[in-house]
């Protein structure tokens, strides 16, 4: 199928460790043909916010005519109906690594923690990093992929070996954009835990 799950994250450095995507089972999701010509899956409640902004940008860049609809809804589903649907991972190295593990990865999971307040209503899951991710990982018996060492540096299984995780954010985004896999990278402020003594960013590792 020539379509993309439009997922989001505030921690790009965790994307090489991605093993699943998560939707809210009770929310509505749509398969849409967007003004940029691509077909996406995302939450119905966030269509105007995400795709409307993209259409405005395309008009300013004179890539589409003013008045062009931001999207056309092709199909609508409950999140639960997407459960188990598989997708191609962003990084080939991750795909090869997970293929050697006994657990299946890279499919849609469901959990009520996914909200409609930000993003696309589809959340990236890396069970090695983050409490919600770890809970979903246990619930679905997902592969455990941890491409970060004890010093907080990316490991050799990634193209970012030796980089501190937060320093890997930008290279990850650059590589995804080159591969045509980055929809947007908006800058916004959000809370992130830091050490109270040395003020360095903390990493949640399961």
Description of each model-found segment:
Residues 1-16, 28-30, 36, 84, ...:
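Residue patterns forming the tRNA-binding/recognition surfaces of aminoacyl-tRNA synthetases
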Residues 17, 27-29, 35-149, 177:
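Catalytic alpha/beta core of large soluble enzyme barrels
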């Amino acid at each position: 199928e020539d379509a993309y799950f439009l997922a989001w994250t505030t921690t790009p450095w965790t994307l090489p460790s991605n093993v699943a995507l998560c939707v809210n089972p009770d929310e509505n999701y749509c398969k849409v043909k967007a003004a940029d010509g691509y077909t996406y899956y995302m939450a119905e409640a966030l269509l105007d916010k995400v795709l409307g902004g993209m259409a405005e940008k395309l008009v300013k860049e004179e890539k589409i005519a003013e008045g062009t609809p931001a999207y056309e809804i092709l199909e609508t589903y409950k999140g639960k109906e997407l459960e188990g649907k598989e997708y191609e991972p962003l990084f080939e190295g991750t795909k090869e690594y997970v293929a050697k593990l006994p657990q299946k990865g890279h499919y849609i999971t469901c959990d009520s923690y996914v909200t409609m307040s930000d993003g696309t209503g589809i959340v990236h899951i890396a069970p090695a990093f983050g409490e919600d991710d770890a809970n979903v990982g246990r619930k679905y018996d997902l592969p455990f992929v941890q491409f970060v060492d004890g010093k907080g540096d990316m490991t050799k299984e990634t193209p970012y070996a030796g980089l501190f995780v937060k320093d890997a954010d930008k290279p990850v985004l650059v590589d995804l954009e080159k591969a045509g896999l980055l929809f947007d990278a908006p800058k916004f402020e959000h809370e992130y835990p830091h050490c109270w003594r040395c003020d360095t960013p903390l990493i949640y590792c399961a």
